[in-house]
């Protein structure tokens, strides 16, 4: 093959297509679809993906540039993933390069560097020449200041300095230095004997190697530790020819120091067996089917997953298990590693870039056959997939909010169709869309209505916080919750307290004039964080110190409103001074391994109360937890989002599911200011069916999913009028060109009307069947492409929005 079609690493509308490159003779027969290459593009060299190799090019009459270099020896993307990338960019209206990069770990994304080189015979002033190394090269990033940059620029224009563009990977393979003897044991003994007393450390190394088996290789760090020596001693012995060194690649394994207790399959209950049987039959017949496994919390869904995977692996096939990021607890990893050992790769955001890269390479090299991971693990480069499982399928974190804005569930179904294998969606509170599909027979519904071993569902009490206020209780803890906490701790049992937000106090307010500090770049109030006494914007990252006086009226009466985890922790220590509390939130778990340490400490009984935000709502299973308290059930209910009632019911049901999962019965106390709302009322009886009927009636009335599909077009500009006018034109174009059944809402200012100094307007498109919608939206992007490329106007399109803010 003589030519390669390459998608280059440039995210603009004009360049969103394959370019032809000539394959040089020395790379012929080596370049394959799915490989990464370095190609010249304009004045620079950039990374690209090979989408096809072919005999001839339509441009063969013109001068076609050559592929510069090959970055891979085997394709990093399989043929199936290459096809999937086209579907993904089409479905999400994203650039082809963006879709391709979404499938790979960050380590494989290119790092670009400009290198400056002194031209032959150039005469440079000493202050410039001094900056260049012995090889007469200098990295652009190493230029010390603007004055030097100006000087260098002049010499580049004169031709004294050449500029070249380099492409590198972000992470390298981890290589470990190994040491072994370079002589026989007799020779080593003889040399050791001839050494003086001053060379005792050299003797120690030689004696150690004499005691080891012949030809053994030992990591240099281990050798130094065992013989109490340094690398300088090793270097001396290498120079003497007695030792030799070699470098071997090792994986960065986040679990290498952990022992996983081997587990055996558990006997299934009759209900579990009835749910497992249809999955087993589908696996045996190699057909594609989507199952919705609707099982109450603690009903044994994980055991069904494990036994299904066992079947898949026994057939020599591979499996993907997706778990929400916050459910990827050590407990969850233990379940899969305990059953399948070294066949498991784990991928989540807690791993370093290098660790993620190494887990991906285990999959790519076919060294593992099961991946357990968060959203992006759906792109694991398996070529013989036998099953995909999505646990907690209702979780909104399966939807990516940046381009490409894909939903992992849709990608899973697409991949499973290709591999002719089943998808299992599991949840105690499925999305209305999934449950409606199961009711229509698009998915097959499997139900688990009881907890395993006949354990009862926890008793749920609702506490009306308005009544508490009327009765003079101004505390964030109701009388009932305080009594239950004291009783639980007195019995030596544990409690989980859940708060539906993060941070210390939600906002700061002046009690005299009502002023609330807003982010200067976004239309959103700043969040107060007590550690460091800072106000932070969670949208753009802006930070500032807490004001001591009001910037508006100079009053000193500044008050902190809201109840964040830090504040709750302080209150707890006042009202229950002897209680041991572990707080889990973004601040306490930001350091690597902190999440695991805190959960292990709680599991070992080192605390009475686990206090936290969303991250403690799922996947935790502690036998001694008998009480769950929800401090603020209403937070998610009052967000301007058509899914707010659904999210509230899901969250409260999931949190309630943490109580009484073993022998001891559980109790849940939910504090609320809106106890009559059906999403809160129905949590009491764990009644998903009734909630589904209620919410479906509301969605039908309001023309929301699953009755209609949604698309969201958001326009932003630094000038409010430009954003509004552009959004108005887009809405007008859509209204004129969409079908009569399609509804266009807006344009209106987005709920958060300004982020990072850009004003935001949005249009919501509600449609049942709109075959031309994708083409119409592409036309809009095409029409505004110049303004978009110049960053004047930004238009984002979300074909299945989960965030309406």
From Swiss-Prot:
Cofactor(s) recorded in Swiss-Prot or TrEMBL: Zn(2+)
Hydrolase recorded as keyword: yes
CDD domains: DEXHc_priA (cd17929), SF2_C_priA (cd18804)
Region ranges (Linker): 111-166
Location of the region described as 3'BD in the Swiss-Prot/TrEMBL record: 1-110
EC number assigned by the record: 5.6.2.4
Gene disruption: observed consequences: Filamentation, slow growth and poor viability in minimal medium, sensitivity to rich medium and to UV irradiation, does not replicate some plasmids.
InterPro entries attached to this UniProt entry: DEAD/DEAH_box_helicase_dom (IPR011545), Helicase_ATP-bd (IPR014001), Helicase_C-like (IPR001650), P-loop_NTPase (IPR027417), PriA (IPR005259), PriA_3primeBD (IPR041222), PriA_3primeBD_sf (IPR042115), PriA_C (IPR041236)
PROSITE patterns named in the record: HELICASE_ATP_BIND_1 (PS51192), HELICASE_CTER (PS51194)
Residues covered by the Helicase C-terminal domain: 545-699
Cleavable signal peptide: none
Domain Helicase ATP-binding: start-end pairs: 282-448
Cross-referenced SUPFAM superfamilies: P-loop containing nucleoside triphosphate hydrolases (SSF52540)
Phenotype for residue 19 to A: Hypersensitive to methyl methanesulfonate (MMS)
Gene Ontology BP terms: DNA recombination; DNA replication; DNA replication initiation; DNA replication, synthesis of primer; double-strand break repair
GO cellular component: cytoplasm; nucleoid; primosome complex
Family as reported in the entry's similarity comment: Belongs to the helicase family. PriA subfamily.
Other known facts: Between 50 and 100 molecules are found per cell.
UniProt name for this protein: Replication restart protein PriA
Native source organism of the sequence: Bacillus subtilis (strain 168)
Encoding gene, per UniProt annotation: priA
């Amino acid at each position: 093959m003589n030519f390669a079609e390459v998608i280059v690493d440039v995210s603009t509308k004009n360049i969103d297509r394959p370019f032809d490159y000539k394959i040089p003779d020395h790379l012929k027969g080596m370049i394959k679809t799915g490989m990464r290459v370095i190609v010249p593009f304009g004045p620079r060299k950039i990374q690209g993906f090979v989408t096809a190799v072919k005999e001839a090019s339509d441009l063969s009459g013109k001068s076609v540039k050559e592929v510069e270099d090959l970055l891979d020896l085997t394709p990093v993307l399989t043929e199936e993933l290459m096809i999937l990338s086209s579907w993904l960019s089409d479905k999400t209206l994203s650039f082809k390069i963006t879709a391709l990069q979404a499938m790979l770990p960050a380590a494989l994304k290119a790092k670009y560097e400009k290198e400056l080189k002194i031209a032959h015979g150039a005469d440079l002033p000493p202050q410039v020449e001094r900056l260049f190394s012995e090889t007469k090269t200098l990295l652009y990033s190493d230029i010390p200041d603007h004055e030097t940059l100006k000087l260098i620029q002049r010499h580049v224009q004169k031709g004294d300095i050449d500029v070249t563009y380099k492409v590198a990977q972000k992470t390298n393979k981890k290589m470990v230095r190994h040491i072994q003897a370079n002589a026989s044991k007799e020779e080593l003994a003889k040399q050791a004997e001839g050494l003086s007393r001053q060379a005792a450390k050299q003797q120690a190394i030689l004696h150690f190697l004499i005691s080891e088996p012949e030809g053994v290789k030992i990591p240099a760090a281990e050798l130094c530790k065992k013989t109490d020596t340094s690398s300088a001693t090793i270097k001396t012995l290498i120079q003497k020819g007695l030792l030799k060194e070699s470098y071997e690649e090792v994986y960065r394994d986040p679990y290498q120091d952990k022992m996983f207790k081997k587990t055996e399959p558990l006997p299934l209950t009759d209900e579990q067996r009835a749910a497992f049987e249809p999955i087993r039959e589908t696996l045996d017949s190699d057909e594609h089917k989507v199952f919705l496994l609707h099982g109450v919390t603690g009903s044994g869904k994980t055991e069904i997953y494990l036994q299904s995977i066992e079947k898949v692996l026994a057939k020599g096939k591979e499996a993907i298990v997706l778990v929400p990021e916050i459910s990827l607890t050590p407990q969850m990893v233990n379940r899969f590693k305990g059953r399948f050992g070294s066949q498991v790769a784990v991928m989540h955001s807690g791993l370093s870039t290098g660790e993620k890269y190494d887990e991906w390479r285990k999959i790519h090299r076919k060294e593992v056959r099961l991946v357990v991971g968060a959203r992006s693990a759906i792109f694991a480069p398996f070529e013989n997939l036998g099953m995909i499982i999505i646990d907690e399928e209702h979780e909104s974190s399966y939807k990516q909010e940046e381009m490409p804005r894909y939903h992992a569930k849709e990608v899973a179904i697409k991949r499973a169709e290709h591999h002719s294998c089943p998808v299992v969606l599991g949840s105690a509170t499925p999305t209305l869309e999934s449950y409606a599909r199961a009711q229509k027979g698009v998915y097959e519904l499997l139900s688990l209505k009881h907890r395993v071993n006949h354990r009862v569902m926890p008793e749920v009490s609702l506490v009306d916080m308005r009544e508490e206020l009327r009765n003079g209780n101004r505390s964030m803890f109701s009388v009932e919750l305080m009594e239950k906490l004291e009783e639980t701790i007195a019995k030596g049992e544990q409690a989980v307290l859940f708060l539906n937000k993060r941070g210390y106090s939600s906002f700061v307010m002046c009690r005299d004039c009502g002023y609330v500090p807003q982010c200067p770049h976004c239309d959103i109030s700043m969040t107060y964080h007590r550690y460091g006494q800072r106000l932070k914007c969670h949208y753009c990252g802006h930070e500032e110190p807490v004001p001591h006086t009001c910037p508006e009226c100079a009053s000193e009466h500044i008050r902190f409103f809201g109840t964040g985890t830090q504040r709750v922790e302080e209150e707890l220590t006042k009202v229950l001074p002897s209680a041991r509390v572990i707080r889990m939130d973004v601040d306490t778990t930001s350091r690597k391994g902190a999440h695991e340490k805190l959960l292990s400490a709680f599991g070992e009984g080192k605390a009475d109360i686990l206090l936290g935000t969303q991250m403690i709502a799922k996947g935790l299973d502690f036998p001694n937890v008998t009480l769950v308290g929800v401090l603020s059930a209403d937070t998610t209910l009052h967000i301007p989002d058509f899914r707010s009632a659904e999210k509230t019911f899901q969250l409260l049901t999931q949190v309630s599911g943490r109580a009484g999962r073993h022998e001891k019965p559980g109790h849940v106390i939910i504090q609320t200011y809106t106890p009559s709302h059906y999403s809160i009322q129905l949590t009491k009886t764990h009644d998903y069916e009734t909630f589904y009927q209620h919410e479906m009636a509301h969605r039908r009335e309001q023309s929301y999913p699953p009755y209609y599909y949604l698309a969201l077009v958001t326009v932003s500009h630094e000038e409010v009028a430009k954003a509004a006018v552009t959004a108005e034109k887009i809405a007008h174009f859509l209204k004129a060109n969409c079908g009569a059944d399609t509804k266009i809402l807006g344009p209106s200012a987005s709920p958060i009307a300004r982020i990072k100094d850009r004003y935001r307007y949005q249009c919501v498109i509600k449609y049942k069947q709109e075959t031309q919608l994708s083409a119409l939206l592409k036309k809009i992007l095409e029409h505004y492409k110049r303004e978009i490329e110049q960053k004047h106007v930004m238009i984002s399109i979300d074909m299945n929005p989960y965030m309406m803010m």
